[in-house]
Every structure is written in structure tokens, then in C-alpha cells.
Amino acid sequence: MSNQATSEIKFVIVIATYYRKDGLTLKYLTRCLESVKKQTYTNWVVYLIGDEYENTDEFNKFATLIDTNKIIIHNKPDPERKHILDKSRLWNIAGASAMNYGLNLARSNGEKYYVHLDDDDFWESKHLENLYQAYQNYSNCIFAYTKSTYPYAHVVPNKILPREDIKSIFPNNLLPRNSNLIHSSVSFRCDIIPFDYHTTHNVSEIKGPSDAIMWDTIRQFILSNPAYCCIFIPEVTCRHDEEGSIKN
């Protein structure tokens, strides 16, 4: 098992979060962080980015759930929700500026291996182990992801994304594309992939979900740069059992 903290592959786990007035963030984020602590692969650090988290005492307490040398927290002001008042449109870009803050902090700190985790999602214990194996076995891999649960059977009948029944692992066995993967299942080389998540304060500039735009952009980047590849790992290691709470 490749769980040595001395491995050169160190994952930066960026989690953007906000204060839900129904109190559910405490439940969600505690579960989320507990799943990180249970990872069999242990060379990681959490960047917990508050999207103007209003309850600052609660936000600061989240840092106590992880060893102090394994977490960096920052509460970022000026979230998208202050500018985009249509919740159905806000859902497309909510938290993108907080994610970009974490992503670019990782880049400025010289980190290479970005991993995303939504605060209301969580991982099975071997999620990072699987991503590590992808990077370890394929040195030209710059994007890796796994299977994930999905909550709506009327959209995805077996409630698993991606939809394809891929069983073998090889370079570009399943390139990313919008609406076919879950954000929290993803990792990429942030030192090679230069893009940020699309965000705006102008409702007329919302082009679609920020992560979906990112996947299509990265797909084209990989196709245009054949020295690099994507690795899809056909194992369910990500739990995305609900979504769209910001619309409610």
C-alpha cells in the first residue's frame, strides 16, 4: 500500500465552504473532513476556503478537526452570491472564486497535485490511494478521476458517473467531459494545467457550470498536447449523494 508520507506526490485538497443558514454545513463538512482523515494515502494537506463564511467561530473550529500541520484555512470575502441573486443561475458558479483562491494558493506554494472536494461530498478510504497510483504508474498523467455516486436516477439510471462501463486503465481511457463526472472525484496537475474556474459577478456572463466548463477546457488541452494523458479509475471512491442545495 502506497501510503508513505515521504512520497513526492503530495495532494492539496481544496474544499470551498459557506455557512448554510439551516445549520447543515457543520454536519456536511465534519463528514467531509472525517473522510479525508480516513484516507489510506496520507501525504496530503487541506486548503479549507471559506466563501465569506458568516459564522467565523464555527469556521475556525473546523481547523481543529485536522492536525494543524495538515490544514490551511482562509475565509475569503466577496462571494458570488452577493452579486448573482438568481439562485438557479448562481448554482453554476457559486464558490468558484473560493476554489480559484485555493487553486492559485496551491500554485503559488509550488504544489503540483490538486484535488477537489465539495463540502457536502465525501470519499471512500482509498480515493487518494487510487489517484496516487494513476500518477505513479503514468508519469505523463495530468488529470485523474474515479467513479462517483450520483443522486438522481431519472438522469443517471444506475446513479453512478461516469456513465460508460470502462474496466481497463490505460492513457486516455475516458477523457473528461461536462455532465459525465463528479467534481469531487477529480485531481489534476495544477502546475501544468493553467486554467481557473470560470466565475463572474455579472449574471449575463454565466456560461454554465464552472466545473463543466473546466472539464471541457482540460479535455481540449489534453487532446492538443499528446505528451500528456488522462487516467480514469473505474472504482467508486467518491460519494456525491445530494446536490443543488444552494438552489433551495
Swiss-Prot record:
The protein's matches in InterPro entries, at most eight in alphabetical order, are given as: Glyco_trans_2-like (IPR001173), Nucleotide-diphossugar_trans (IPR029044)
A single GO molecular function term of this UniProt record: glycosyltransferase activity
Report whether Transferase shows up as a keyword of the record. Answer: yes
**Gene3D superfamilies in alphabetical order:** Spore Coat Polysaccharide Biosynthesis Protein SpsA, Chain A
- What UniProt keywords apply to this chain's record, in alphabetical order? Glycosyltransferase, Transferase
> What Pfam family is a match for this entry?
Glycos_transf_2
Coiled coil ranges: none
Q: Which domain of life is it from?
A: Viruses
Record-listed E.C. numbers: 2.4.-.-
Is Glycosyltransferase there in the keyword field? Answer: yes
Q: Which family does it belong to?
A: Belongs to the glycosyltransferase 2 family.
Q: What is this protein called?
A: Uncharacterized glycosyltransferase R139
The organism encoding this protein is Acanthamoeba polyphaga mimivirus (APMV)
The lineage is: Viruses, Varidnaviria, Bamfordvirae, Nucleocytoviricota, Megaviricetes
